[in-house]
Amino acid sequence: MERSEVWFPINYLILEALKRYHFFYGDDLKVECPTGSGVLKNLREVAHELSRRLIRIFLPDSAGRRPCHGNDNLYASDPYWKNLILFYEYFHGDTGRGCGANHQTGWTGLVARLIITEARYASQ
């Protein structure tokens, strides 16, 4: 089954909502995350798990490939291009490959806020 596209503004709003619901429900409300794992997490933990997944779209793997650039070798191997990160309009739900316009620094730039939030969360 193919997943639908990943849009940063919608995902960001979902993350914020999960954190607010956790503020209200605390550890009394837990859901399975990831689905099918049998692992129960509170909503704050789920928000951070989803946030880390969104951040990974931009991180290089062991071969230097970033999911946001798909299979384009230019961005993985060329020394002049490998550190260029494009902020696509939306992303493929299964692969993380960037789709649509690649100059969406506005809403896709929310990844910077996610990185800051995750760094703070990890240091607690």
Short names for language-model regions:
Residues M1-Q124:
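Acidic, mature catalytic/reactive cores of soluble proteins
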